[in-house]
Design a protein with these regions (language model features):
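Asp-based, Mg2+/Mn2+-dependent phosphohydrolase catalytic module
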Residues: 10-117
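Structural signal for alpha-helical transmembrane segments and their flanking helix-loop junctions
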Residues: 4, 8-9
Length: 117
């Protein structure tokens, strides 16, 4: 399973993340930053670019998001969107995604595949 971070943060902000958490670079196949796409979330550009990079389609792409703009961007990309109620409440996140998680405890690959649009 290929995984990427698709962030509205720029390279400079991500450099600070890498200094604080160097392991982040090795946890993902790609990290796509704001310099790589023209419009920020809630536009779907970052997710569409991610699909292009991995040569995949919305039907086989899962977006995990906690921000409102990220959730909107994921839905606009037509991927399956899993909302994380880590920053905002379940009630606020639920209308903007296909499934809501409080955290990743007990969430497996098989459970992810059971989430449908």
């Amino acid at each position: 399973v290929k995984m990427a971070v698709l962030t509205s943060s720029n390279d400079r902000k991500m450099a600070a993340v890498y200094r604080a958490r160097p392991e982040v670079r090795t946890m993902f196949d790609r990290i796509l930053t704001a310099e790589m796409f023209s419009r920020s979330k809630p536009a779907p550009d970052c997710f569409l670019l991610g699909m292009e990079v991995f040569d995949t389609t919305p039907d086989t792409t899962y977006v995990f998001e906690d921000s409102f703009n990220g959730l909107k961007a994921g839905m606009a990309s037509e991927a399956t969107v899993i909302g994380l109620a880590t920053t905002n409440s379940r009630e606020a996140v639920a209308p903007l995604c296909h499934c809501v998680l409080d955290d990743f405890t007990g969430f497996t690959y098989d459970k992810m595949l059971q989430v449908h649009k």
